Amino acid sequence: MAISRRDLMKVAGVSGLAALAPAFVRAQDKKLEKTDVSIAVGGQALVYYLPLSIAEINGYFKDEGLNVKIADFAGGSKALQAVVGGSADVCSGAFEHTINLQTKKQFYRSFVLQGRAPMIGLAVSKKNMPDYQSPADLKGKKIGVTAPGSSTNMLVSFFLKQHGLKDSDVSIIGVGAG
């Protein structure tokens, strides 16, 4: 009987988890270093942060012995500033913020992934731009982002560059998350 690659990977995965089981058991016995934790988030009402909201609503933090206070900011960049400034312990934000901080010699670690893909979309209102045909039509227009320096701002900048435009060709306005 031949063993398929898939079956072999299953056995290897289970074996690996079994080898780590004692470490998981020991980790659960340890006391928490800190039980009061403040999380800064850049627009908690956004679908981007749904996993955080679900954890809060369902009491997952309390179940783990944590007293979590969530502070909602106008955008991810503002939430990150709260962590850098010391008024929050953790930032729930886009991964690229950790990369941007590295360019400033500040090294923060990402330790949880809330989604498999960016949950940000760009849209043009037919009411405001009924004749929109291409990204070139955005020249001279106002584009709303959650906050300057936020992941929405970065996405807009990337989109503009991909279509031969610069940030200076438009007015990027921080409008918050709501």
Segments from the language model and where they lie:
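Active-site-proximal beta-alpha loop/turn segments in soluble metabolic enzymes
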Residues: G178
